[in-house]
Amino acid sequence: MIQLLKKEDQFNRTIFNGNFLANKPVANGTKDNVKPYSSLFYWSHARAIGDCEFGLHPHEGFEIMTFILEGNVSHYDTATKVWTPLETGDFQVIQSNSGIEHSERISKGTRNFQIWFDPNFYEAVKKAPSYTDYHSKDFKPIMEDGIKTIIYVGKGSIANVLTPGLSIKRLFFDKKAKYSLQLDKNSSYTFYVLKGDTVIDGNALTSDDAVRISNLENLEVEFEIEGELFYIETPLVSNYKMIWS
């Protein structure tokens, strides 16, 4: 199964008087084509046109990850009780568990992903919350199947996460070429085009477009010039009930 999610078909939102623009390939309660699946509940790509601040607000149960694609974010939460700076290439993992509150200050020009997972909500709320920063220096690119790859989460990563069967990677393509990506037919994937124009399994996509994939073992990817893909892999079938189901 391949489902295209062009930027204009995602859930798009503007807040803070036009200073914060978000396109969301996964968002609960908005549009049927971007509804949650597997353990992936929410995925937002945001651009800060001006400085923005989200005041202290609560979360529980979900595992929430923020990836700084460019720019700067300062984060405060009630687990650490300090403001923590995050820069380009860094990411954070909030295991909100029994409950946590946090604030975010986002600098002008920043782009980031915020992604929520259900790690088994009904069990997570029995655990104490935690917050962990990870820095770009600890995630050097490697060559995987002939493609320059950063492994954020999954086998080969130092990141500690609760969500079972989760893999998150960033792929860099530096020349015109065709690639055949090996997929697991027992997994679901969403690929997000971070940079460049690409053709994925015969479908033309550009920056900020996305594609959902399942029940495939191979994926043909072609870039005309350099480009980047960011993808999330989760189990096709989970062994626990999701909070939204």
Regions found by a protein language model. Give the residues of each.
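Conserved hydrophobic/aromatic beta-strand scaffold that supports enzyme active sites
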Residues: 45, 64, 91-93, 112-116, ...
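Conserved short histidine dyad/triad with adjacent acidic residue
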Residues: 3-31, 41-59, 69-76, 80-83, ...
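Short acidic-glycine-tyrosine-enriched beta hairpin
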Residues: 77-95, 184, 199-223
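Structural motif
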Residues: 72, 195-197, 228
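Conserved, well-structured core segments that form or line functional sites
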Residues: 100, 110-191, 195-203, 207
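Ligand-binding loop in jelly-roll beta-barrel domains
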Residues: 96-126, 214-243
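"Short basic amphipathic alpha-helical interaction patches in structured regions
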Residues: 79-87, 106-107, 127-133
